Amino acid sequence: RIEATREGIFELLEDLGEIPNRLRDKMEALEELGDLKFLFKLAAKADSMQNFVKDAEKYLQTKEKQE
């Protein structure tokens, strides 16, 4: 289920352009389904890759600070 959610994110983002390698690597390292579901929702709502990257980085930085 984790892999399917991750692939769903990548498929949604394909229409917006290329995912920056750094962000792709971070998303591939995620193992919590809740994190991937949150990013899936961000990807579904994103109107541009730039906006998705900004929101995803903000979320991931917040997660890193909590750990």
Give the positions of each predicted feature.
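Elongated, amphipathic alpha-helical interaction scaffolds
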Residues: 1-67
